[in-house]
């Protein structure tokens, strides 16, 4: 059978090369020639089709690319923002590019974001875009593995746990974790023998974010487990949260095998916690008899509209989703905030003065941080976090799958509009993916003065785009409470519409308290030049070789003992 197949292949090669100078060459030479020429032929045909075959008039223009299937993947992957800005200059705010066989239509600007985030669920869905990435990590029966109406109910349940009452408890817990980390971590212990230390701030923030999140949202069992097996489970599960699994899911990779094993073990870990708490009756409220103010305590109490309580599996997988989604984004944002402040040490001193003015105890010292003051009385600290998110939104691209042809409003793009056809517009075909990139608007020089500069004070000036970005927002209840639908804003670091991040307030609280605690204890500056962004992971991180900052304790800093 093999011999017959080889003979047929050789015969075919002989026919192909019969009229060429390679007619008398060996089969191996002919085979190699074919392997070289076929890709070249594919490139030629791909280029010819783009030059000779016109794109339908009502379809967005397609970004020119040489290699079929791969398309613009390399160009986009190296620097998405450079890709977006250059394509906008050439094609406008709406254009399509090929990404590893998928057709991605990009809609830029505030109106483009509004199109993506507020399109009807019957036309575009997030679950069809992301479930193959998230479900193996989060688990079944939650988030994008369930119908959208169920997911909206689950978001409502999580929102219950993100209450002001819980936030009041979380502030001192976060402070305690930060101070304990500085006391016990080996890198900081070097301060006992020298005046300054150099710290990889991304590594430190990755550790602090999970420590503070586990102490507050995740619960005491998770916090205790961070020093044991849970930390390894998290690492293995996290290894499956990679771009390759978004593009080509379920490859037989060692990292995916580890991911799947870790998901089962972590799921069982949480299910055991839920079972023990329910057995002990520790599920009455956020201030129940066990004194728990974490998310598990809140979820145990919740019921769907049909009266069914959440199962242990659902709670376990919602907790995993909460852990994984918040860890990456907050680690990145807090790291960028520290690095941006390190590039402007004078702002660190302004933050310290703000702490002295707001938290003075009247005797030359500082009161402990509290929720009410953090929420209402530290405008510069809030502005630092907002400005960091403006320049460094964690996600550079947000996608939806187009289920049915989607009309682009004429106000966004009208390639065929005439006096006789004033309403003509692009139509994004079914089967495309539609992509928003809010970060483009957030650094657009047509919107922001000195758009590439880190200037928290822009948020304190009532006349700037920054100060006005939150005004006049429409609100809608998608099933988990009233939220802003204001996707027309040029500032959308947490998204908009039905899939807007519900952890926004906790993120501001967590990052703000960590920053304030460090500002009270340290001054810092960059160890080298400001790092470039690294676009190779799921969120935009600072490049590994530029994360070092130099910390110097304040002479008047609080004692950590």
Curated annotation (Swiss-Prot):
Gene3D superfamilies: Cytochrome P450 (1.10.630.10). It catalyses: a 14alpha-methyl steroid + 3 reduced [NADPH--hemoprotein reductase] + 3 O2 = a Delta(14) steroid + formate + 3 oxidized [NADPH--hemoprotein reductase] + 4 H2O + 4 H(+); a 14alpha-methyl steroid + reduced [NADPH--hemoprotein reductase] + O2 = a 14alpha-hydroxymethyl steroid + oxidized [NADPH--hemoprotein reductase] + H2O + H(+); a 14alpha-hydroxymethyl steroid + reduced [NADPH--hemoprotein reductase] + O2 = a 14alpha-formyl steroid + oxidized [NADPH--hemoprotein reductase] + 2 H2O + H(+); a 14alpha-formyl steroid + reduced [NADPH--hemoprotein reductase] + O2 = a Delta(14) steroid + formate + oxidized [NADPH--hemoprotein reductase] + H2O + 2 H(+). Its main location: membrane. It comes from the Eukaryota. Heme binds at residue 501. It is found in: Membrane. Its cofactor is heme. Signal peptide: none annotated. Keywords: Heme, Iron, Lipid biosynthesis, Lipid metabolism, Membrane, Metal-binding, Monooxygenase, Oxidoreductase, Steroid biosynthesis, Steroid metabolism, Sterol biosynthesis, Sterol metabolism. GO terms for cellular component: cortical endoplasmic reticulum; membrane; perinuclear endoplasmic reticulum. It is an enzyme of class 1 (oxidoreductase). Belongs to the cytochrome P450 family. PANTHER family: 24-HYDROXYCHOLESTEROL 7-ALPHA-HYDROXYLASE (PTHR24304:SF2), CYTOCHROME P450 FAMILY 7 (PTHR24304). This is Lanosterol 14-alpha demethylase. It comes from Mycosarcoma maydis (Corn smut fungus). The lineage of its organism: Eukaryota, Fungi, Dikarya, Basidiomycota, Ustilaginomycotina. The gene is ERG11.
